[in-house]
Amino acid sequence: MKKIRIGSRDSKLAIIQSELIMSAIRKYDPDIELELITMKTTGDKILDKTLDKIEGKGLFVKELDNALYNNEVDITVHSYKDMPLEENPELPVVALSKREDPRDAFILPQNGENGEPIGSSSLRRQLQLKELFPGCKTAPIRGNVQTRLKKLDSGEFSAIVLAAAGIKRLGLESRIGRYFSVDEILPAASQGIIAVQGRVGENFDFLKLFHSEESLCISLAERTFVREMNGGCSTPIAAYATIQGSEIILKGLYCNETTGELRKECVSGNRNNPVELGYELVKKMKSSKSI
């Protein structure tokens, strides 16, 4: 009997996302034995600093990557938006989920009181919030979803902004006060998509029922744009792609950190060329005098 060991962060959301993959594997072959192995990453342990002050998104994958290298697990599970833009060729992304809701969500405290500040450690979100609500104050917040909700409900923040996909997967949709449209707050590249990583050269047929070619297409466009604009975890760059028939529509956001000016651009092209479309949006964005 074949056995597959799945590596995951130990947060409730990460485990739920891993269970979605395990369910798809069972549908593919009920005889495959599955083992979930959870671990705490460095990014989960360091909560008193924003990601740009430590090592960025790589801190959420380092321990999981090591587990793959050391053959302690066979695949690892990630929120794709939290993975480094420069992917490791020895540990490729081997499957992507269908995209959940890509929007950001506005979460209010259970007591319903409003005030300041709004909690978000994402500069991408902070700058778009300030453009949407001039004069609003924001402050960084770290931790998993449950930790952030506790901080919100204890009165540390008047509201927090989180990815809607995670809130929905946790069954906490009732906590959402409102959704931000993608025109109000452009999401992070690959937001709402779960990624599975494995070792190069191995067989991953058992992920066929889980993998979404559409997610691969839109992620290639989004991540190419953000990577080529030099966007890391703290850089205010965002991208969102949709497929309409044979075309991809790709929207991008860039902030000039010197002037604080936000710029948005949009391009469209053949869905068979997502990487080229990402480069096209980079060229269009960089042609602006404000970049």
Swiss-Prot record:
The modification S-(dipyrrolylmethanemethyl)cysteine is found at C233. Its cofactor is dipyrromethane. It comes from the Bacteria. Binds 1 dipyrromethane group covalently. One of its GO terms (cellular component) is cytoplasm. GO terms for biological process: protoporphyrinogen IX biosynthetic process. Its EC number is 2.5.1.61. It catalyses: 4 porphobilinogen + H2O = hydroxymethylbilane + 4 NH4(+). Pfam families: Porphobil_deam, Porphobil_deamC. One of its GO terms (molecular function) is hydroxymethylbilane synthase activity. Disulfide bonds: none annotated. Keywords: Porphyrin biosynthesis, Transferase. Pathway: Porphyrin-containing compound metabolism; protoporphyrin-IX biosynthesis; coproporphyrinogen-III from 5-aminolevulinate: step 2/4. InterPro entries: HemC, Porphobilin_deaminase_cofac_BS, Porphobilin_deaminase_N, Porphobilinogen_deaminase_C, Porphobilinogen_deaminase_C_sf. Tetrapolymerization of the monopyrrole PBG into the hydroxymethylbilane pre-uroporphyrinogen in several discrete steps. The porphobilinogen subunits are added to the dipyrromethane group. Monomer. Belongs to the HMBS family. This is Porphobilinogen deaminase. It comes from Ruminiclostridium josui.
